[in-house]
Each structure stands twice: as structure tokens, then as C-alpha cells.
């Protein structure tokens, strides 16, 4: 491998996830100098430029459309993508912040977003676009007969949502920006002169339970507005690449944990000093979403961490609507539905959500001072349930309490004791990284994942998931987890910090 090999990392909406190795290389000073010169203004002492070069814009658009037109299985409704100036501006604003996470929060309600960062040798933005698309190798397309009513999420790698956002059929606009960050914290390491790429998309994709596109003969199901025009397997209106059109609403996944990337073992040279890897509590790796009284199920459901919410007090007096009884329409307020069902009272609290598929109608009733509304129209539904808390010891496993059962399983919020780190592995094993075998010790796993401190213990949230064939060990926070190949027993889980 070349000694100029660079670090490449990509981040895709939990925010998850679903993921923490680094690619080490010896940077070439000439490459780095050229890169910095390319993205800086020529005036003395000017700020780093975030606008992207027109040649890069054209390459990004051409590559997106090329990749969208060659999906397999073929897409019957894949639309042509154009550049959007407003999305570019929003990407510039976020790239300027030099924060390695999705944002800003207010904007994520209306756009999709892919992120990438590298350090060292120059890479064109299209290089990262291709790397996002390359997640296709881990993605299995859900055919219509598998969607009953929700399509299964089948990603055998650490992340597939960058790929699905790129090939989301109804996403028709993209705008990107590049910024050279003087100092950027990337998962605990401080990178100097980090090259940060932000691409914003609209309408956003990655709706939970939906396929990214319809399978069929190319252009056979294009929207009527395209007038039957087709170009390179894409629904096509004209040859205009750039536009100043408004942002349209849709949904994107926020990963909640970093990706597992291959380790390229090269000689170190001029690498920025890394922040010491000490035991620390992650403030970003959260499963519970804090929401408002008016937040609807459909508006809030982002990524796989879409089942636990924290409601504020005072929602009885809110005017947000609730449709149904027991089974609630996805356009209902989550918190008021929870009060209606009796899961929480007007003081707020935690609510677990279970999606229940499409129902033909919803029946009104008045319960706990909340009046729900009837709706005689088919829609997706959900149920609410109470979140309990359970104190456990260092040896308790997910398999003992809440092993994954399709379609979904909820676990209590667990309270871990301190000092589980040094418990022997034959009593308190930890198997895997980011996604763990459910025979692992919950509390020792929490220390390994960095969601609690060993000397303090504390609360953690757990999400049971389907088992993985392979689990890869790692040494994190003073704990060496185990690797297992061709694992056939049990299921798996993910673990999250709790923000008190």
C-alpha cells in the first residue's frame, strides 16, 4: 500500500451507529499542502473557504446520478438528482462548525445528511460519495413480499444508510460543502487540518420500514410530472444540473455510534496527537429521544433507535391530536397517546413504542383527560408501553431478561453497579464491539462501550437486535472483548448511555 494512504471515516442520522477503528498512514506533505491551498482563499489571514468548487459540484452530481441509475435490482421510480444552492449553503454553515456529528438539530427535521472526514492526502469529494455507495455490498434489498407492512432492515455491515440515502428514489436535490478544520475532535482524537465534507439531501430518505426505491423496469413508475421522460434509467425532466429550489421534508437516519472501519497498518508519520483513550461516558450514544408534547410518531422516528422517548410534563393541556384507542395512528402525538393509554401521567416520563403495521381505521375514546379522534382511513399504527427500571449485578445478561424476539423486544432501563470492569470473563464475558452477543454481561459491556464509568456505574438503555454471524473483539476502556466466528446461539444487543 502507498505510504500516502489517508484516513477515511464516514458518519451516516444514529446517530448508531449500525463501528471504532482507524486507518493509519504516513501523509505526504506535498499532497497536504496542495489540499490546504485548494480550499483556502488567496487573501491573507482569510477564513477557510467552505464553498465547493464547480468542478467538484459537477462530479458529485454526475456520480450520484450514475450510481442511482445502476442500482441492482433495478429501480422503476428512480428520479434524476440536481444540485441545490440552498442545501449547499446549509452544508457550508454546518461544515464551518467542525463538529463530527449530524446537525444542526433543527435542520435535520427536514433534510438528509451524509458526512465524511479525512486527513492527509488530497481526496476529491466524489471519492467519499463512492465510498458511501460502496456500503451496497452489505445491503440486502427488501422485495415487496418481504414488507408486511414494514420492510426489514438488512445491513450486514456497520452502516448502510449512506448508501440508501444516495439511492433514495424520491431524493432529488443535493448540496455539499468542504471545510478544512484547523482542529477537529473525531471520536476522541484531535485531527489537525481535517478535511470535512458535508452533503445535505432533500427530500430526505431513510424512512424506517420502507425500501429506498421500487423494483421494476427502469422508469416504468416515474411520477407524472416527468412526462414519461427517461435518461440513463432515471426519471428525467431536463438537462439542468443546478437549481435554487426550496427544501422538501422527508426523513433520514442518524447513526448513534461510529463505524467499524478496516485497520490499515502503516508507519506513523506526523500524526496529530490523539486524545488519551480513557474511560468516559458518551454523551451522544443515546437511545432515548427527548421530544415535545406535539411530536408525532412519524415525525420523530429516526434510525433504528426509534422505540424509546422521554415526554415532558404538562402534555394534557396540549392541543396535539391523538387518533385511535390502544392502537394509535402514526400521526398521533406520542406523549398524549401515552397519557391516553395510561403509560404516563401529566408529569411526563419514559415511553416505549412498538410499531404495529397498517390498520384500516382508528376508534375514538376519552381516557385520562385525553380525548382521541376516530379516523376511518388506512394508516400505520403504533402502541405505547411503560418503561420500567431494574437494578442488576455485574453478571446479568440480556439473554436472561429480554432476549430479542421478532419483530421487536423492549428491555427495562438497567441500573449497573460500579466496578464491573475487573470481573473475570468466565463470569462476566463481553463478546463483540458496538453490537454484542446477548450472553455478554450488560454492565461490563457498558464500560467497554464507554456509556458508563467503571468507578461510578449508572443507568443504561439496551436494545435487543437479531444475532450477528460474527462478533469482533476490541480493547476499549481497559476491557478486552472477545471475538466469535460463525456464532449460532442466542441473539445480540446494542447498549446506550442515559442522559440524566
Swiss-Prot record:
Q: Which superkingdom?
A: Eukaryota
Q: What is its main location?
A: secreted
Q: Which Pfam families match?
A: CAP, LCCL
GO cellular component term, pick one = extracellular region
Secretion signal, residue range per the UniProt entry? 1-23
Q: Tell me the ranges covered by the SCP domain, including all copies.
A: 62-201
Disulfide bond entries:
293-311, 315-335, 394-416, 420-443
> Where is the region Disordered?
260-281
Domain LCCL per the UniProt entry, residue ranges: 287-382, 388-491
Q: Matching InterPro entries, A to Z?
A: Allrgn_V5/Tpx1_CS, CAP_dom, CAP_sf, CRISP-LCCL_domain, CRISP-related, LCCL, LCCL_sf
Q: What is its subcellular localisation? A: Secreted
UniProt KW keywords: Disulfide bond, Repeat, Secreted, Signal
Cited function: Promotes matrix assembly.
Q: Which family does it belong to?
A: Belongs to the CRISP family.
What is the protein name for this chain?
A: Cysteine-rich secretory protein LCCL domain-containing 2
Amino acid at each position: 500500500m502507498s505510504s500516502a494512504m489517508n484516513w477515511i471515516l464516514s458518519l451516516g442520522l444514529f446517530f448508531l451507529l449500525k463501528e471504532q477503528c482507524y486507518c493509519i498512514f504516513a501523509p505526504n506533505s506535498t499532497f497536504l499542502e496542495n489540499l490546504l491551498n485548494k480550499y483556502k482563499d488567496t487573501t491573507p489571514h482569510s477564513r477557510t473557504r467552505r464553498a465547493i468548487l464547480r468542478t467538484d459540484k459537477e462530479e458529485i452530481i454526475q456520480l450520484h446520478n450514475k450510481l442511482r441509475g445502476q442500482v441492482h435490482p433495478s429501480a422503476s421510480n428512480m428520479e434524476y438528482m440536481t444540485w441545490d444552492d440552498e442545501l449547499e449553503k446549509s452544508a457550508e454553515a454546518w461544515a464551518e462548525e467542525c463538529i463530527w456529528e449530524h446537525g444542526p438539530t433543527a435542520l435535520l427535521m427536514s433534510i438528509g445528511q451524509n458526512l465524511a472526514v479525512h486527513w492527509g492526502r488530497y481526496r476529491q469529494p466524489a471519492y467519499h460519495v463512492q465510498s458511501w455507495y460502496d456500503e451496497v455490498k452489505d445491503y440486502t434489498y427488501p422485495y415487496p413480499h418481504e414488507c408486511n407492512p414494514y420492510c426489514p432492515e438488512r445491513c450486514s455491515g456497520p452502516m448502510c444508510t449512506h448508501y440508501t440515502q444516495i439511492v433514495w428514489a424520491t431524493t432529488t436535490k443535493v448540496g455539499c460543502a468542504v471545510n478544512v478544520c484547523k482542529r477537529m475532535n473525531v471520536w476522541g482524537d484531535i485531527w489537525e487540518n481535517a478535511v470535512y465534507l458535508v452533503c445535505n439531501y432533500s427530500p430526505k430518505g431513510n424512512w424506517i420500514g420502507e425500501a429506498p426505491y421500487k423494483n421494476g423496469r427502469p422508469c416504468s413508475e416515474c411520477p407524472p410530472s416527468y412526462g414519461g421522460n427517461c435518461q440513463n434509467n432515471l426519471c428525467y425532466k431536463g438537462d439542468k444540473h443546478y437549481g435554487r429550489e426550496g427544501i422538501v421534508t422527508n426523513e433520514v437516519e442518524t447513526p448513534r455510534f461510529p463505524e467499524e472501519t478496516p485497520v490499515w497498518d502503516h508507519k506513523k508519520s506526523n500524526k496529530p496527537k490523539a486524545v488519551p483513550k480513557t474511560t468516559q461516558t458518551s454523551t451522544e450514544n443515546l437511545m432515548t429521544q427527548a421530544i415535545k408534547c406535539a411530536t408525532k410518531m412519524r415525525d420523530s422516528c429516526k434510525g433504528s433507535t426509534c422505540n424509546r422517548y422521554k415526554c415532558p410534563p404538562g402534555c394534557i393541556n396540549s392541543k396535539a391530536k391523538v387518533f385511535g384507542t390502544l392502537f394509535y395512528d402514526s400521526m398521533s402525538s406520542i406523549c398524549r397517546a401515552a397519557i391516553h393509554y395510561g403509560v404516563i401521567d401529566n408529569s411526563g416520563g419514559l415511553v416505549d413504542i412498538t410499531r404495529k403495521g397498517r390498520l384500516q381505521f382508528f376508534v375514538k375514546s376519552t381516557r385520562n383527560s385525553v380525548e382521541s379522534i376516530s379516523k376511518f382511513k388506512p394508516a400505520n399504527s403504533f402502541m405505547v408501553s411503560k418503561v420500567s427500571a431494574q437494578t442488576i449485578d455485574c453478571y446479568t445478561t440480556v439473554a436472561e431478561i429480554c432476549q430479542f424476539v421478532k419483530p421487536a423486544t423492549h428491555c427495562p432501563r438497567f441500573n449497573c453497579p460500579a466496578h464491573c470492569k475487573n470481573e473475570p470473563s468466565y463470569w462476566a464475558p463481553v463478546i463483540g464491539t458496538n453490537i454484542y452477543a446477548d450472553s455478554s454481561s450488560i454492565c461490563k459491556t457498558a464500560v467497554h462501550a464507554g456509556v458508563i464509568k467503571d468507578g461510578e456505574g449508572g443507568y443504561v438503555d439496551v436494545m435487543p437486535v437479531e444475532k450477528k454471524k460474527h462478533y469482533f473483539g476490541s480493547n476499549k476502556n481497559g476491557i478486552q472483548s472477545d471475538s466469535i466466528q460463525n456464532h449460532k446461539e442466542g441473539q445480540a444487543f446494542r447498549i446506550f448511555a442515559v442522559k440524566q
